[in-house]
Amino acid sequence: MAIDMKAIHDSQSTLVMGVLNITEDSFSDGGLWLAPEAAKAHGEAMMKAGADIIDIGAESTRPGAKRVSEADEKARVLGAVDALIPEGAVLSIDTTRASVALAALEHGAQIINDVSGGQLDRELPHVVADHSDCLYIVQHWRGWLAGAAGNVPDADTSRYEHGVVNDVHD
C-alpha cells in the first residue's frame, strides 16, 4: 500500500515511484495500460509490489512524440486518478498542462511532475502554488520533442530568462 503525503514530506529515505503510462505510443510499454481497467490493475499491482507513489502520464515524451489533445490527456488522467485514489494511492501526474494538473489535483492527486520545467505552460507553476499541499517535481527540458520537422531540438531551446530556480520559484 502507498504511504501518505506526510510520510513523503518527512521521508529521510528513498521512495519508489511506479510509472503508469496511459498513452498509445509509450516507448516502454506500447500502450498496455491505456484502458481504464488495465490502468487501475497495473497501478494496484505496482502498489502491492512496493511503489510508494504512482506517476501517471497520459502524453508520451519519447523523442519525436506528437502531442495528444488536452481533452484526451485530461480524460485519461482523470480516469486513472479516479480509479486509484480509492485504493489509497499517492499520485503524481506527469503533465505539462495547467488545466490537466488542476483537474487532477481537484480529483485527489498530490504531486505534479512537470517535464517542461514550467516552460510549456507558464500557468502550471501557479496552479501548483495555489495548492499548498501539492509537491512539484520540476525537470529540465530541451523543448518539445517533436518539432515542426519531427526532429529533437538542440539543447539550447530551453529558455530560463532569470535562471531555472528563479523562473519557477514564484
Regions found by a protein language model. Give the residues of each.
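N-terminal amphipathic alpha-helix/helix-capping segment at the start of soluble metabolic enzymes
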Residues: M1-E24
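Generic structural signal for well-ordered alpha-helices
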Residues: G43-E44, V77-V81, A101, R122-P125, ...
